[in-house]
Design a protein with these regions (language model features):
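Fe-S-dependent hydro-lyases/dehydratases of central metabolism
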Residues: 1-322
């Protein structure tokens, strides 16, 4: 599998059942990097052992007047000067797109302090983790996990007009989250349907696989991938990535892109995914379901009352904001 190829290259344990991973690069952002840095410095950090990106895209400036937390950014900038990091100033980039465009090569592994860390469309197996694992990586320590199961996501067909990547992602999440079919496993996107998708479309699906409860995701690479690297000035980062002729998977999810329809996710999790047409046709049923679920979710907080049915006007859903 693609997953095996990438993990084997990064494993230092000598045992593919129990992995000790070293990453190619890492990324952190402004509402997590202070604690990560302080932990790493208190534990002996001198220089970052790999390229380490610091972005400022997660709204710590929004608290009061847009300036109250500028000291956070100064702290990170000084850490980059001190220890050799890459500081991306506020308002310049969102972390995941920066990593895709500037850092990730085919076959790489990255660790980033955000749950939606997914750079699989470039042939990378990347991990979103909490602060302690990022601090460990800053200190040159291994990321230790057992070898994960791998699920093939076999794509056929092509999306219809008005169907976007979120519709495909919600269809997948709705099918596999509640039954734990892909939990803590790696999703490997293969099949003839991949070539019908632009890189941005693939990225939109890829970043949402987190909500399926999988560990990571990776895609075969092709000419669209090669062009993506060329457009962003890094043609040398591209590598043809595909499974071997006898790749063995622990399971398979088949998605016929021809049949995917516009979807909507209702509270309180993206796996509550339904065809948008069904919700529009019977809003009483679906919004009533959400209200009943809210009673269970907020049973210990009697002050919270979810009123969605009042948004139904003449049989149609009134949207307050978007």
């Amino acid at each position: 599998t693609l997953t095996y190829q990438v993990l084997e290259k990064h494993n230092h344990s000598g045992n593919m059942e129990h992995l000790q991973i070293k990453f190619d690069c890492m990324g952190v952002y402004d509402n997590t990097y202070v604690g990560i840095l302080q932990t790493a410095y208190a534990s002996g950090l001198k220089e970052f052992p790999m390229p380490c990106v610091f972005t400022n895209c997660h709204n710590c400036l929004c608290a009061v007047g847009g300036t109250i937390n500028t000291d956070v950014h100064k702290y990170a900038e000084s850490a980059c000067v001190k220890s050799g990091g890459i500081f991306v100033p506020p308002h310049e980039a969102v972390i995941h797109q920066y990593m895709r465009e500037m850092m990730i090569n085919s076959g790489d592994m990255a660790i980033v302090s955000d749950s939606h860390t997914r750079y699989g469309t470039q042939g990378s197996v990347s991990i979103g983790e909490g602060g302690p694992e990022l601090a460990k990586a800053m200190l040159g320590k291994y990321y230790e996990i057992d070898y994960p199961q791998v699920i093939a996501v076999y794509l056929t067909g092509a999306p219809k007009p008005w169907v976007g990547p979120m519709d495909v992602a919600l269809s997948l999440i709705g099918a596999v989250f509640k039954n734990n079919f892909v939990k803590n496993k790696v999703l490997e996107f293969v099949g003839p349907g991949v070539k019908s998708l632009s890189m941005d479309f693939r990225n939109g699906i890829d970043t949402m696989t987190t909500e399926s409860a999988c560990l990571s995701s990776v895609w075969v690479t092709d000419e669209n991938t090669r062009e993506y690297f060329e457009v962003h000035g890094r043609p040398q980062g591209y590598q043809k990535m595909e499974p071997g002729s006898q790749a063995l998977y622990d399971g398979i999810v088949e998605i016929n892109l021809d049949t995917v329809v516009p979807m909507i996710a209702l509270p309180f999790h993206p796996s509550n995914a339904y065809p948008l047409a069904d919700v529009i046709a019977d809003p009483e049923k679906y919004l009533g379901m959400v209200e009943e679920e809210a009673k269970r979710v907020f049973e210990n907080n009697k002050d919270i009352h979810l009123d969605l049915k009042s948004k139904i006007i003449n049989g149609k859903i009134k949207v307050d904001q978007a």
